[in-house]
Amino acid sequence: MRKLKFYVILILFLVGVNCFIIERYWVRFQEYEFKSDKVTKDFDGYKIAVVSDLHYGFLNPEFWVRWVIKRVNSQNADLAVGLGDYVKKRNTDVELLKVWPILKELKAKDGAYFVNGNHDHWANDKLSLELLEKSGRSIRNKNIVIRRNISKFILAGIGDFWEDRTDIDKILSGTFSKDLRIVLSHNPDSSNTKHKEKVDLFLTGHTHGGQVRIPFFNFSPVLPVKDSNFDIGFKKNKFGEDVFISAGIGWSILPIRFFCPSEISLIVLRSP
């Protein structure tokens, strides 16, 4: 009986260490390939580093966030994107003012671009948008062209689904559907908003991959989205478009992760 009790306590201890420390703080770099007829040979192998849901603040201190950004930079990605929820607390300016100088250290060959998430708005709606625009790296409600030789693709970003404007057709106006179009959005539910312009790939976060996933069944019992299909990895929206959901880095509500480690997603474009 004592031996059984010892093993039960040991298992619970190891699970606790895994949930509270290992999976939360040991950020993995996971590659995902996206293949499309619109990816030209010039962009074959093009790597996009996805930074989502940092949630700087309680239990995610400044030195750790800086370490994460340095690790992303060490990947020497072609492009880096921030998908929002950079802070945790509501109704405070402090975390926003501290995290943005760190975010601006994010580097890639073709630059780093950002959109905001709901937590950024909840901290201070006006200030979060002001800091985003002042960073010089905002892609909120706009688009840019990324070029390689004579090839190009469109990178666009939309405001948060819960707290900002989401007008996909407007931000893609003036672009052409023959070109690859990648849209950044914090919340994957944004992809289900009505739009006529074709999007080839949405890059999103928000769900933390469910944060807690049931082993063997590979699902999360709690997801902060309308469409329960949007948990982690590549999914399809109701228009048949590809949506990628990153597991992200931080946590919400409970400071744990279970079978869902913190992650920097690396999207690798592939031509046919």
What are these regions (language model features)?
Residues 27, 31-60, 158-188:
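Mobile, glycine- and charge-enriched loop segments
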Residues 35-49, 144-156, 176-178, 236-243, ...:
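Beta-strand-turn-beta hairpins that frame and shape the catalytic cleft
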Residues 188-265, 272:
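Conserved beta-sheet core of the metallophosphoesterase superfamily
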Residues 42-140:
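Membrane-embedded segments
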Residues 78, 85, 179-181, 200:
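Conserved acidic residues
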Residues 51-56, 84-87, 118-119, 142-143, ...:
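Active-site metal-binding loops of divalent metal-dependent hydrolases
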Residues 130-137, 148-185, 191-193, 197, ...:
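Binuclear metal-dependent hydrolase catalytic cores centered on His/Asp/Glu-rich metal-binding motifs
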Residues 1-42:
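N-terminal membrane-anchoring alpha-helices
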